[in-house]
């Protein structure tokens, strides 16, 4: 995926104006401009729906990859993050959400540059993300690892 870096200025402005502790790019934002395959849109929508149910995240898209954090927010949870791979940023957002940090979604301009519609993601990657998601659910909702001490 191509995410033009000039988008970052608007994200930084939201952090500077104290409107958010975390600003993330969202393909689901109404003002996003997307060149994105239908199969990926369907898979993404299903996964985001699952995340909303499991974690009560007030965001529609966790996986776009463009994110900005206030240093103090990220420092407060980074030692708690155990996940590697594609679900890493989900765990970060869940941990921040558990600690009541403000997460704001911003539109993205995205050009999908892969021909087959799936890019580098393989079935084993998808299965690993689901496995990691359940581990994050366990840490967040059963063990309550991300709550403030």
Regions from the language model: what does each represent?
Residues 1-2:
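Acidic metal-phosphate-binding loop of nucleotide-sugar-dependent transferases
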Residues 5-86, 113-123, 127-130, 144:
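Acceptor/aglycone-binding surface of glycosyltransferases and processive sugar-polymer synthases
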Residues 53, 99, 136, 140:
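Phosphate/oxyanion-binding loops and surfaces in catalytic or ligand/nucleic-acid-binding neighborhoods
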Residues 57-58, 80-84, 93-111:
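Catalytic donor-sugar/metal-binding loop of nucleotide-sugar-dependent glycosyltransferases
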Residues 70-73, 101-102, 136:
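Secondary-structure boundary/capping motif
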Residues 90:
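DNA-recognition element of transcription regulators
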Residues 131-149:
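C-terminal, non-catalytic tails of nucleotide-sugar-dependent glycosyltransferases
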């Amino acid at each position: 995926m191509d995410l033009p870096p000039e988008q970052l200025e608007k994200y930084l402005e939201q952090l500077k104006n104290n409107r958010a502790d975390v600003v993330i790019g969202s393909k689901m934002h109404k003002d996003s401009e997307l060149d994105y395959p239908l199969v990926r849109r369907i898979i993404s929508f299903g996964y985001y729906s699952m995340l909303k149910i499991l974690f009560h995240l007030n965001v529609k898209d966790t996986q776009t990859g463009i994110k900005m954090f206030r240093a103090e927010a990220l420092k407060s949870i980074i030692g708690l993050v155990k996940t590697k791979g594609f679900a890493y940023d989900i765990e970060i957002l869940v941990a921040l959400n558990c600690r009541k940090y403000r997460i704001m979604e911003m539109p993205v301009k995205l050009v999908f540059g892969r021909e087959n519609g799936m890019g580098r993601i393989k079935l084993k990657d998808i299965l690993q993300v689901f496995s990691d998601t359940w581990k994050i659910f366990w840490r967040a909702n059963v063990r309550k690892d991300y709550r403030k001490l």
